[in-house]
Structure formats: structure tokens, C-alpha cells
UniProtKB/Swiss-Prot annotation:
Residues 1-63 are annotated as: Unknown. Residues 64-153 are annotated as: Small ribosomal subunit protein uS19. The keyword rRNA-binding applies. It comes from Hydrogenobaculum sp. (strain Y04AAS1). GO terms for cellular component: cytoplasm; small ribosomal subunit. InterPro entries: Ribosomal_uS19 (IPR002222), Ribosomal_uS19_bac-type (IPR005732), Ribosomal_uS19_CS (IPR020934), Ribosomal_uS19_SF (IPR023575). This is Small ribosomal subunit protein uS19. The gene is rpsS. Keywords: Ribonucleoprotein, Ribosomal protein, RNA-binding, rRNA-binding.
Amino acid sequence: MGFRGAWNKRNRLIEDLDTFLKLYKKAQKAYKKVRKVEFSNNDELIENAKKRYQEIWDEFRAFVNKKAWVDPKLWATIRKMNQTGDRKVVKTYSRDSQVISDFVNHTIAVHNGKTFVPIYITPEMVGHKLGEFAPTRTFRSHPEKSAKVVKKK
């Protein structure tokens, strides 16, 4: 029952970041409560905590499923940078976050499993996932045929 980001099918933008963050924090608190209560012997407490968490989680999923998924911390950072006019490189592990219009003209360093790959966001990238621009595998040319390799008929 861990927290996972929802995948969006409609590619819409979340306009209300404050509501999103409130629901996100509410879901996290409810999940922590479930984890805390699981060690008690009171089955009624456990069931109530799980039921409450499920209600909050369903509300969060209903809100997120209609919108594009963006990591809340990444979005909050970019939002602050837009307000102050900063243009620093932002590091993120969130490859599944979608590029939204707020990210345009920013450089986001996306982790590819080994290093952070800096990506300058352009308007053409809006709607794509950040992970699409940070390849996880390096392509080295195909091996050349050597004289030792002989085809058998």
C-alpha cells in the first residue's frame, strides 16, 4: 500500500497544486498511521486506519488520474524558481514525471541510473516523460565482422 504516482491517460495539467499537495500529505499521514497501528493487537483500530487510508487514497487517485503526473517536490521547486526568476539546475530521480509548460526554459538533471543527465526543456517536450530524454543505456557501435568469423552453410 505504498505511495505511488498515478499514470495519466488524458495528459491534462494539474492546475491546483495546493489541493494536490494537501491530498498528497494527507495520504502520507494516513499511511503512516496505518503502519503505526499495525503493531497493536486491536483489530478494530487496524481496520479503521486502513479504511480511512483507503478513502483518502481513493480521493487522491481520483484527483490525480485526471491530471498529468508530476513529482510534487519537483513541481514546487520549479514553481518557486519561476516566481523568483532563478535558473538553477534541478536534480530529480523522477523519470515518470511529465513535462509541463511550467518547466519550459529550465534545466532539469534526470537520473539515468548512474549519473544525472542535464536536460534543457523546450516547448516541444511538453507532454512527454522526463525519462524519455535521459537514456539508461549507452549505445556503442555494432561490432565489425572480423576475418575469424566464417559463415557455415
